[in-house]
Swiss-Prot record:
Source lineage: Bacteria, Pseudomonadati, Pseudomonadota, Gammaproteobacteria, Enterobacterales
GO molecular function, one term: bis(5'-nucleosyl)-tetraphosphatase (symmetrical) activity
Entry-linked InterPro entries: ApaH (IPR004617), Calcineurin-like_PHP_ApaH (IPR004843), Metallo-depent_PP-like (IPR029052)
Organism of provenance: Wigglesworthia glossinidia brevipalpis
Transmembrane segments: none
Protein name, UniProt field: Bis(5'-nucleosyl)-tetraphosphatase, symmetrical
Length: 272
């Protein structure tokens, strides 16, 4: 059995299908993990979503910020933007089935035997493995619950009372909002506990006080490799040896990238 890890697809169905052909994807033998943001921005998000749903026994996903965005749109908490390119999904006859499945998907995947963690954006240095699992599970439980719309509404409300600083004594709902932002949106940290959600540029062009989250020492990365997406502008940036960034900007005329974990071989499909 081969284990493949794929970066942000962003609705690029043609490239996704080409990748499955390139790796000779075999339903009997292969497993794929996708690092979130498999919908949004690109031209064929509905096709991508339906294919992943159809192959859900072999293809596993983590939620990214664009999947959370779809849930917010479905719940009518925010208005759709043209650049979202999610109208086709929202008008689909099987929308309820797809949304029901989507909100049951995890924020992270862990393979304890292979020592892999997949997450869409990243983590904060302050967290250990127990923190990561506990905090993500709390958010996942809310997304699965009947009250998920109420939860999402609170996640979306802008609140300046609490800055983006992790403290263990924060109210539980604030910690859940921070957790969701960290896991699906983080790029930079200001310190071991404070995150920046504004800057997206390459580290060489960022303000001096901002440090990529993976540059901090962390207890988790002593024993596990972390595979993530989200940050296409660092596709040529050298990350630590056990940190793998797989977003190579497929929806921005870049590439779709897959990593075969068994032999660390990379596969790439150019954007069409």
């Amino acid at each position: 059995m081969s284990h493949y890890l794929i970066g942000d697809i962003h609705g690029c169905y043609s490239e996704f299908k080409s990748m499955l052909d390139l790796i000779n994807f075999n339903l009997k033998n292969d497993i794929i993990w996708i690092a979130g943001d498999f919908i949004g921005r690109g031209p064929d998000s509905l096709k991508v979503l339906r294919l992943i749903y159809k192959l859900k026994r072999n293809i596993f996903v983590v939620l990214g910020n664009h999947e959370i965005n779809l849930l917010l749109l479905y719940a009518k908490i925010k208005k759709i933007k043209e650049e979202d390119k999610l109208t086709e999904i929202l008008n689909a006859p099987d929308l309820k089935i797809l949304i029901s499945w989507l909100r049951k998907q995890p924020l992270l995947k862990i393979d304890k035997q292979k020592k892999i963690i997949m997450i869409h954006a990243g983590i904060i240095p302050k967290w250990d493995m127990s923190d990561l699992i506990t905090n993500s599970k709390k958010v996942e439980c809310e997304l699965k619950s009947k009250n998920y719309k109420k939860f999402l509404k609170f996640m979306y409300i802008k609140n300046n009372e609490h800055k983006n600083i992790w403290k263990n004594n924060l109210p539980e709902i604030i910690k859940m909002r921070l957790t969701l932002n960290i896991i699906t949106r983080i790029r930079y940290c200001i310190s071991e506990t404070e995150i920046d959600l504004l800057h997206k540029e390459h580290p060489e062009k960022s303000p001096n006080h901002l440090i990529p989250w993976f540059k901090f020492k962390n207890n988790i990365t002593k024993n596990y490799s972390i595979v993530f997406g989200h940050w296409s502008s660092i596709k040529d940036y050298k990350t630590p040896k056990n940190i793998y960034g797989l977003d190579t900007g497929c929806c921005w005329k870049g590439e779709l990238t897959a990593l075969k974990w068994d032999n660390k071989l990379f596969f790439k499909i150019k954007s069409k």
